[in-house]
């Protein structure tokens, strides 16, 4: 299956194909001339897939080097970026060479940031191996690293030259790592794709059901993301819809300590919290929050977080990228499959946290 992100200046394809990881070299050869490629990955994904990807690339005529960093959100920072820069310089990477991100969302975000800033930008490809990365973070060109103040506070827009998704990589994910990706999938059904929501409603929520329907889940999720990105590449309008649950979700990740609450888990909690407050204010229909809770809990996603420190969460929210002056843009779902922006004074955000 293939989708095209038809941006005017940087169009690229998303290829979804089981077993495609072993064909990485042939795929890259269609996109890039023979050159040096730096594979950026973490130590866990590297142990699983580095050899397969590296061998395929070298058989296709590419010279490869590998930069690995410790697995986890705690590594997504400027210290790791500087280590990557040093590695690239020492290995003679030039502007005519390229970077491949092999891994989950942390790897993709960090590798994309490195690619977009090293020598003012070099070629970049995404090979996402987690569900969260396959349905969300590998598409759309957002890169970024965390700071002590906020998640993804330092970042760029850097569209990849292509995205290769092998659903078979999901089989090696731990249960928690697979399930957290469903937070983003549930979001897509809520904000845009009623058919996807109804399909999810029919699944029993087990790991087996997710893996069995992975191709469908990935394709439909990518199609929502693709459509929104093409309409609003730089996040000034409808792309904000993709942030449903993320405003509070990012604050939870930051205040809990990066890596303690996984991204998709935080998104699920954020969607429930925003919906509960919006429903109380008449901005979302009665019963919507209950539907979201039921769907999240079926797949094993959390819907609450403890401790719930309102002051810490609010302080983190003041650094959110959707904050404009003394207001913040919240995404709500006035009806299933339809999102909207609700702009409120920043201080009113306290009410959304206290419900």
From Swiss-Prot:
Catalytic activity, EC: 4.2.3.4
Query: Which Gene Ontology cellular component terms are annotated?
Result: cytoplasm
Annotated compartments: Cytoplasm
Q: Which Pfam families does this chain map to?
A: DHQ_synthase (PF01761), DHQS_C (PF24621)
| Parts of the chain that traverse the membrane | none
- Where along this sequence does the record place binding of Zn(2+)? 184, 246, 263
Comment on bound cofactor? Binds 1 divalent metal cation per subunit. Can use either Co(2+) or Zn(2+).
Which keywords does the record carry? Amino-acid biosynthesis, Aromatic amino acid biosynthesis, Cobalt, Cytoplasm, Lyase, Metal-binding, NAD, Nucleotide-binding, Zinc
GO terms classed as biological process: amino acid biosynthetic process; aromatic amino acid family biosynthetic process; chorismate biosynthetic process
Q: Which InterPro entries match?
A: Dehydroquinate_synthase (IPR050071), DHQ_synth_AroB (IPR016037), DHQ_synth_fam (IPR030963), DHQS/DOIS_N (IPR030960), DHQS_C (IPR056179)
Catalyzed chemical reaction(s): 7-phospho-2-dehydro-3-deoxy-D-arabino-heptonate = 3-dehydroquinate + phosphate
* Record: residues binding NAD(+): 71-76, 105-109, 129-130, 142, 151, 169-172
Pathway given for this chain reads: Metabolic intermediate biosynthesis; chorismate biosynthesis; chorismate from D-erythrose 4-phosphate and phosphoenolpyruvate: step 2/7
User: Which cofactor does the UniProt annotation name?
Assistant: Co(2+); Zn(2+); NAD(+)
**A single Gene Ontology molecular function, please?**
3-dehydroquinate synthase activity
Q: Which family does it belong to?
A: Belongs to the sugar phosphate cyclases superfamily. Dehydroquinate synthase family.
Query: What's its job?
Result: Catalyzes the conversion of 3-deoxy-D-arabino-heptulosonate 7-phosphate (DAHP) to dehydroquinate (DHQ).
Q: What is this protein called?
A: 3-dehydroquinate synthase
Organism per entry: Streptococcus suis (strain 05ZYH33)
Provide the taxonomic classification.
Bacteria, Bacillati, Bacillota, Bacilli, Lactobacillales
Identify the gene encoding this protein: aroB
């Amino acid at each position: 299956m293939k989708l095209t992100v038809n941006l005017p200046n940087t169009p690229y394809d998303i290829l979804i194909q089981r077993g495609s990881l072993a064909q990485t070299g042939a795929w890259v050869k269609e996109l890039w001339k023979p050159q040096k490629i730096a594979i950026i990955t973490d130590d866990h994904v590297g142990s699983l897939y580095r050899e397969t990807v590296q061998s395929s690339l070298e058989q296709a005529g590419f010279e490869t080097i590998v930069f690995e960093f410790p697995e986890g959100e705690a590594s997504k920072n400027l210290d790791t970026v500087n280590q990557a820069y040093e590695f690239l310089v020492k290995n003679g990477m030039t502007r005519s060479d390229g970077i491949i991100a092999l891994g989950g969302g942390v790897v993709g975000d960090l590798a994309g940031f490195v690619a977009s800033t090293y020598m003012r930008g070099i070629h970049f490809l995404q090979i996402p191996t987690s569900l969260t990365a396959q349905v969300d973070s590998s598409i759309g060109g957002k890169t970024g690293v965390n700071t002590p103040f906020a998640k993804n506070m330092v970042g760029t827009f850097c569209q990849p030259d292509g995205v290769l998704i092998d659903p078979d990589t999901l089989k090696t994910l731990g249960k928690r790592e697979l399930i957290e990706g469903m937070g983003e999938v549930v979001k897509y059904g809520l904000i845009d794709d009623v058919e996807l929501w109804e399909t999810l409603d029919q699944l029993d929520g087990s790991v087996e059901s997710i893996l069995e329907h992975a191709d469908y889940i990935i394709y439909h999720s990518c199609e929502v993301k693709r459509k929104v990105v093409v309409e609003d590449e730089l996040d000034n309008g409808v792309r904000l819809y993709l942030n449903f649950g993320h405003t509070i979700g990012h604050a939870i990740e930051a205040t809990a300590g990066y890596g303690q609450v996984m991204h998709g888990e935080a998104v699920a909690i954020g969607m429930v919290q925003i919906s509960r407050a919006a429903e109380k204010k008449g901005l979302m229909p009665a019963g919507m929050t209950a539907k979201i809770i039921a769907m999240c809990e079926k797949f094993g996603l959390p819907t609450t977080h403890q401790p719930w420190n309102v002051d810490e969460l609010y302080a983190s929210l003041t650094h959110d990228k959707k904050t404009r002056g003394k207001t913040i843009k919240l995404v709500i779902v006035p009806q299933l499959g339809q999102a909207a922006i609700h702009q409120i004074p920043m201080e009113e955000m306290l009410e959304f946290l206290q419900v």
